[in-house]
């Protein structure tokens, strides 16, 4: 048997290969690459068919009609030829485009490679320069030290020998590996091989992509990544430049509001939130990143981390309000603002009606002013005056205070037949507090019992000295009914205004004071504003208290629509988003965003203030407050009024109603009609709803009937306060009064089975009744107080026993009675109390 039996002949085709190559990367990663071998199929022509196969591939054969395949027309053949030519043309263009792209990529790679090499070369040169500089400095230092040492040796030895080159120095100057006559050691050979291997790896890294030949041959295996190379170069550069030391910590200015989240504080300091939480825990505060801390604590944390705290306040949003002082050349004369003040029924509104030649007082409920009014009057001389009419009732203290704050001149109206009254004194105090000049108008001079001198004398008690009493306060005797003295009053007002020299800048952004505010059914929130500075125009965006808005319309005191209102002009402003508080200041701002931001801040501040005022700080205070509330009876009410000032006056008046045992609690007060929401609130708290010059709508009336909620309407504040006082008086505990009706003397004590000890008595004074209370006196000391169990005369049970008669008495649950004791007999009466 031959050696080749059963074996296949050897050939160049090779065995079957898997077609996969493993590609190695850095960090021990590998990747399998699938290698595809492109094969071309070679068709071997049959014998005798070589000529035909050769001509078939040529285009001339396709165009030859004699040798064309059957069933193909000339047009179809032309289309095929055109498609074939276009395909060949596309192949040529694609090949050219690929070649261009490959060339561009190669150029880009070459450019990047050159840039990287240039950068590395530059870094090496810089590092070499720094190293050379350091070596030169070190060499200079050594030479200086050597020179110093030689000088010292020269001083010690006058004739030194000629210096010979020290063999140790020559050996030290040579590199450690350069040992003459000795071959390199094994460690040096390994170090040199490692250096060559590293250089080879770096070169292979720059050589570009991994090729198929390298992958098949196993070369170019694990190499360092480009990021690692960049890190290495950056470290070398920083080390050469001397940046290896730790960078100095940056000190930041941290904006610190009133409260701040822990996470936000960490972000502003550029510190880790966990470190901030840890610092707070060291201070004894167990907080998380999402909790807020106060500004003082945050400032301590900022200082601990080495930063600077810059305090900012939420109130900074109000800095957009224009508070610039006006220049003297921009100021122009403005009308004076005169406030009419005085006691109720002294004729303030009647006097103003006489000046305006109108009849406002006839339309006032009860003949008294309950709103603050603003009017403009043009005198016969052409002067324009702005008048504010304030209520005189005691409940309208805040209204009078607001009138005094915005006024230039106060006209104090005093009735000649009534002299100085409590609200007159209050008006004097308001005028003095506002530091405004005063003119005394002695009204009702036409009455028979008028006594102007008594008014002047009474004013002396309050440090108001009129001119006729050698003082500096102007006084005028007037009569609103007959018109006497009105011209003199207007002349004095004009004279006082001329002395004050009132001026304002009409060109700046408007600022004014809210005199009155109300909620109109058809027009929405309406505010009566007295413009103090600038000019208020239609379309202006403004903020007033906790509300903001855009001026939709301006209405003057005559009910006419105007486009603008200058200084000292009272107007009604429409376009608010809510009803402001009377006394708030109106400021015009640039944008709606600013107005909304300021209003939101003010609302939040007011809410926090209310919460802080009503909150108990300690458990003891909370318990004491709860106990005090439990001992006080409350009368809950809901107040709705036509204007904001009236609502405030009612609330202030009701807060004064009550004592230590009962008080009035205003659950809610507002302006506008009574709504179903008010009824729901009243039902939940078992309160009454009070409407002052307003009415309930249909749904509110229906809800009140269903839920049995009482609604009361008033138009005069006197009646309202009196009725609430009566209702609050009903919550007071009745006062128990005792009336002594008789005395009885115990003569003998009997023991009766089933009854106990029975006292045999004689009524010495008054009468003894079965239903009355009794006290047992022994030696004029009360030893028992109770009621009678039985009252008998002889053997009959009786209701009462008259004086001088004998009877038998037994006490309820008490038997310690002795002969000689005295029984005091009395009756209790409950008397209903009333609030003062």
Curated annotation (Swiss-Prot):
It comes from the Bacteria. Residues 367-371 are annotated as: G2. Residues 333-501 form the tr-type G domain. Residues 50-60, 167-176 have a biased composition (Low complexity). Residues 443-446 are annotated as: G4. GO terms for cellular component: cytosol. Residues 389-392 are annotated as: G3. SUPFAM superfamilies: Initiation factor IF2/eIF5b, domain 3, P-loop containing nucleoside triphosphate hydrolases, Translation proteins. GTP binds at residues 342-349, 389-393, 443-446. Its main location: cytoplasm. Keywords: Cytoplasm, GTP-binding, Initiation factor, Nucleotide-binding, Protein biosynthesis. InterPro entries: EF-G-like_DII, IF2_assoc_dom_bac, IF2_II, IF2_N, P-loop_NTPase, Small_GTP-bd, T_Tr_GTP-bd_dom, TF_IF2_bacterial-like. Residues 88-156, 185-206 have a biased composition (Basic and acidic residues). Residues 342-349 are annotated as: G1. Residues 1-234 are annotated as: Disordered. Disulfide bonds: none annotated. Residues 479-481 are annotated as: G5. Residues 18-27 have a biased composition (Polar residues). It is found in: Cytoplasm. The keyword Hydrolase does not apply. Belongs to the TRAFAC class translation factor GTPase superfamily. Classic translation factor GTPase family. IF-2 subfamily. One of the essential components for the initiation of protein synthesis. Protects formylmethionyl-tRNA from spontaneous hydrolysis and promotes its binding to the 30S ribosomal subunits. Also involved in the hydrolysis of GTP during the formation of the 70S ribosomal complex. PANTHER family: TR-TYPE G DOMAIN-CONTAINING PROTEIN (PTHR43381:SF5), TRANSLATION INITIATION FACTOR IF-2-RELATED (PTHR43381). This is Translation initiation factor IF-2. It comes from Cereibacter sphaeroides (strain ATCC 17029 / ATH 2.4.9).
